[in-house]
Amino acid sequence: MRYYEKIDGSKYRNIWVVGDLHGCYTNLMNKLDTIGFDNKKDLLISVGDLVDRGAENVECLELITFPWFRAVRGNHEQMMIDGLSERGNVNHWLLNGGGWFFNLDYDKEILAKALAHKADELPLIIELVSKDKKYVICHADYPFDEYEFGKPVDHQQVIWNRERISNSQNGIVKEIKGADTFIFGHTPAVKPLKFANQMYIDTGAVFCGNLTLIQVQGEGA
């Protein structure tokens, strides 16, 4: 399992971070058209959960093959990887929206298996350095009070933990040291949430069509 990946923002014009897609490929493409995304100059980083619950799961999974797209591993990628492995728990995945895979035709199933294998290479944490700012992108949480690139982490905490956001919503807000901004998904909300230097950008695209993109580099950031 890959834990950390570092991205040098100077290689790109504009950079956006997108919330949980959950198979909402057309919604994303429409958003990218609206913002004038240029796949030769710009970069899109996903907070994970590309698949499950929505209708266009293979299309969303295929995004990880494109050079203009990066993603961290979400709990739904992990359930897919585990469910398709020999020792995996397929029922856990099915209960959480994985049924789409078992309704694919033969060709799409072969493609989805290959993409799931590639998804097993996704990092848990992306560090983006953009000019003088450091952004850390994880699916659910960075489970420490201070960030350090390469620090050992419990992968289950990174992709599942809701303790920090729960505390923040109850008024117990703590900054995470070591980076300027932390961007998470995983916990759906009506609008993006911000507590101290943490942003939560899962706005329930698969439930209500509201997909959030946050620009972190370029004009408008």
Curated annotation (Swiss-Prot):
It catalyses: O-phospho-L-seryl-[protein] + H2O = L-seryl-[protein] + phosphate; O-phospho-L-threonyl-[protein] + H2O = L-threonyl-[protein] + phosphate. Mn(2+) 1 binds at residues 20, 22, 49. It comes from the Viruses. The active site is at residue 76. Binds 2 manganese ions per subunit. Keywords: Hydrolase, Manganese, Metal-binding, Protein phosphatase. One of its GO terms (biological process) is RNA decapping. It is an enzyme of class 3 (hydrolase). GO terms for molecular function: bis(5'-nucleosyl)-tetraphosphatase (symmetrical) activity; metal ion binding; protein serine/threonine phosphatase activity. Its EC number is 3.1.3.16. Its cofactor is Mn(2+). Mn(2+) 2 binds at residues 49, 75, 186. Belongs to the PPP phosphatase family. This is Serine/threonine-protein phosphatase. It comes from Escherichia phage lambda.
